[in-house]
């Protein structure tokens, strides 16, 4: 077993060797520009791009013509939300999203607010799922777009996309879904799902970083205002020379995901259950997010009376995160856990374990023993733990104000 043990697959995944192997020729001999229509170098590259587009479409049961290449899910979220909001703004300027969305959605919404759009940010229920009645109640005559992620990056809960999309359809609201964390983890069938726009990323699914895609429904046709101009690539929606090697990598990664997903999810579920069972007998341990409506890859746990930062320092041999990688550089408690109603203390003491393709039972057992040992040691030196063990209710303690 190599240290540190990587249990942070929701931050990024390694590129599958099969994916890397497929990419390499497009960095060396097959280096043509897919937009070069006058020679075989261009034709070869274009064929590779279209094959990859088909593989991405197949994983989510879409038409390849509905797949637009982008630089990743962040760009896809921006193109979908800004593109639709700006194109349809004569219909209305009200948007709906959820407080636990990824920053790529929340910051895009904030940006639109600064240009005159109005956004409703819904609170999730305590289990992290969206209250469908609250969602329905938030829709107004001028609501043009709603954005709800399929799988949450911090707590792994799966939203009821079919039901939310159904409500959007009833009210003529365009529905965008960030599915960066969903591909290869849950079945996605865009023939059936009432979804208009869906964002994908390669690097959460064992593909390379720097490449993603946006699904844009053709029937009924969804129109977007392009955010990137210059050459009219991707049917005018996203200009810029296509990164053939990245695209080939994403196609292969999504092909592998389609073929291996069912068996892989079962294996990961067993490992997640093993991890949960190993930590479940500890005192004052709380699971964040619904355990049923959840991908098997994610376990987000708060260890009460342990300071999150000191726990992270103590478990250096485990690559895990507290909060999302995009925001874990800040010392703020996770905004996702705060939105679930967790106290600052519990939000601060949370660890996100995310398992993946190369996680073994040995890795999980190592994580269990390391966490148990370090949490016990940190609690030994914690006055709060001592007070808790003495039966003092810390919520009723009157702390003296600092002078």
From Swiss-Prot:
Known cofactor(s): pyridoxal 5'-phosphate
Keywords associated with the record: 2Fe-2S, Cytoplasm, Iron, Iron-sulfur, Metal-binding, Pyridoxal phosphate, Transferase
Single Gene Ontology MF annotation: pyridoxal phosphate binding
Group of enzyme by EC: transferase
Keyword Cytoplasm: yes
Subcellular location: Cytoplasm
PROSITE patterns per record: AA_TRANSFER_CLASS_5
Binding, pyridoxal 5'-phosphate: 73-74, 153, 181, 201-203, 241
Modified residues (N6-(pyridoxal phosphate)lysine): 204
Binding site for [2Fe-2S] cluster: 326
CC per GO annotation: L-cysteine desulfurase complex
Catalytic residues as annotated in Swiss-Prot or TrEMBL: 326
Pfam families, per the entry: Aminotran_5
InterPro entries: Aminotrans_V_dom, Aminotrans_V_PyrdxlP_BS, Cys_deSase_IscS, Cysteine_dSase, PyrdxlP-dep_Trfase, PyrdxlP-dep_Trfase_major, PyrdxlP-dep_Trfase_small
Signal peptide range: none
HAMAP family for this protein: Cys_desulf_IscS (MF_00331)
Self-association state and partner proteins as the record states: Homodimer. Forms a heterotetramer with IscU, interacts with other sulfur acceptors.
Protein's recorded name: Cysteine desulfurase IscS
Organism (species): Methylococcus capsulatus (strain ATCC 33009 / NCIMB 11132 / Bath)
Name of the coding gene: iscS
């Amino acid at each position: 077993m190599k240290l540190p043990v990587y249990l942070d697959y929701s931050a990024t995944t390694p590129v599958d060797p099969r994916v890397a192997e497929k990419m390499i020729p497009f960095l060396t001999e097959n280096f043509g520009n897919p937009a070069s229509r006058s020679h075989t170098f261009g034709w070869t590259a274009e064929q590779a791009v279209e094959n990859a587009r088909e593989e991405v479409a197949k994983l989510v049961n879409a038409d390849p013509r509905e797949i637009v290449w982008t630089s990743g899910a962040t760009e896809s979220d921006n193109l979908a939300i800004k593109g639709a909001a700006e194109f349809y703004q004569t219909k209305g300027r009200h948007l709906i999203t959820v407080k636990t969305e990824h920053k790529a959605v929340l910051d895009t919404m904030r940006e639109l607010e600064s240009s005159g759009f109005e956004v409703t940010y819904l609170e999730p229920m305590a289990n992290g799922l969206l209250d469908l009645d609250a969602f329905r109640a938030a829709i107004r005559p001028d609501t043009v777009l709603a954005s709800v992620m399929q799988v949450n990056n911090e707590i792994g809960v799966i939203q009821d996309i079919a039901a939310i999309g159904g409500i959007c359809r009833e009210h003529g609201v365009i529905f965008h879904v960030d599915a960066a964390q969903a591909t290869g983890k849950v079945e996605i069938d865009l023939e059936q799902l009432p979804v208009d726009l869906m964002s994908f990323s390669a690097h959460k699914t064992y593909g390379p970083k720097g490449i993603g895609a946006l699904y844009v429904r053709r029937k009924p046709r969804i129109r977007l205002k392009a955010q990137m101009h210059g050459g009219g690539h991707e049917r005018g929606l996203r200009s810029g020379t296509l990164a053939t090697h990245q695209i080939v990598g994403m196609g292969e990664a999504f092909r592998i995901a389609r073929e291996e997903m069912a068996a892989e999810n079962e294996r990961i579920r067993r490992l997640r259950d093993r991890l949960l069972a190993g930590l479940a007998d500890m005192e004052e341990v709380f699971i964040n997010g619904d355990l049923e409506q959840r991908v098997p890859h994610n376990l987000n746990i708060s260890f009460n009376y342990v300071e999150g930062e000191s726990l992270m320092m103590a478990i250096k041999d485990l690559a895990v995160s507290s909060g999302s990688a995009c925001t874990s550089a800040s010392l703020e408690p996770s905004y996702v856990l705060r939105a679930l109603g967790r106290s600052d203390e519990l939000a601060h003491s949370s660890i996100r374990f995310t398992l993946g393709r190369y996680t073994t039972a040995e890795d999980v057992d190592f994580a269990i023993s390391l966490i148990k040992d370090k949490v016990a040691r940190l609690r030994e030196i914690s006055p709060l733990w001592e007070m808790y063990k003495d039966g003092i209710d810390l919520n009723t303690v009157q702390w003296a104000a600092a002078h």
